[in-house]
Amino acid sequence: MLALKISVYTVVFFFVGVFLFGFLASDPTRTPARKDLESPQD
């Protein structure tokens, strides 16, 4: 039972971490201000 709980928590935290990482990684592309700071085209 303990192994099942550990495995479930591991999978849940893994998917949550991947989701948060993907959201933070794609966030600068959605906000024009930070995108302009990263790659100024003017």
Swiss-Prot record:
Superkingdom of the source species: Bacteria
Signal peptide positions (record): none
Record organism: Prochlorococcus marinus (strain SARG / CCMP1375 / SS120)
Keyword entries, A-Z: Membrane, Photosynthesis, Photosystem II, Reaction center, Thylakoid, Transmembrane, Transmembrane helix
Cellular component GO terms, alphabetical: photosystem II reaction center; plasma membrane-derived thylakoid membrane
Name under which the protein is recorded: Photosystem II reaction center protein I
Membrane topology qualifier: Single-pass membrane protein
Function according to Swiss-Prot or TrEMBL: One of the components of the core complex of photosystem II (PSII), required for its stability and/or assembly. PSII is a light-driven water:plastoquinone oxidoreductase that uses light energy to abstract electrons from H(2)O, generating O(2) and a proton gradient subsequently used for ATP formation. It consists of a core antenna complex that captures photons, and an electron transfer chain that converts photonic excitation into a charge separation.
Family annotation (SUPFAM superfamilies): Photosystem II reaction center protein I, PsbI
Gene name as annotated: psbI
Major localization class: membrane
Family: Belongs to the PsbI family.
Oligomer and partners: PSII is composed of 1 copy each of membrane proteins PsbA, PsbB, PsbC, PsbD, PsbE, PsbF, PsbH, PsbI, PsbJ, PsbK, PsbL, PsbM, PsbT, PsbX, PsbY, Psb30/Ycf12, peripheral proteins PsbO, CyanoQ (PsbQ), PsbU, PsbV and a large number of cofactors. It forms dimeric complexes.
Transmembrane regions: 6-26
Subcellular localization: Cellular thylakoid membrane
Example of a GO biological process term: photosynthesis
